[in-house]
């Protein structure tokens, strides 16, 4: 089987993690994340909680990767975006 090149990224406010990998064609998001070593490096990543995506589009751990894909591990939201907009609007009105 030919190989594919992918990137796995995880971004924090103070630091970004970027791993470039060469995997077998047919590899999944989950396999790429495990191969990146980020799970061992960052104890706060929990694949049962953190959502994942490919190029900013939501994806499933079992989705198959293509050559050149960027796998993204998302941090949990601290506050609902609608609630945040509501709070900002309230502050502006005062």
Swiss-Prot record:
Coiled coil: none annotated. NCBIfam families: PRK01777.1 (NF002490). Belongs to the UPF0125 (RnfH) family. This is Protein RnfH. The lineage of its organism: Bacteria, Pseudomonadati, Pseudomonadota, Gammaproteobacteria, Enterobacterales. The gene is rnfH.
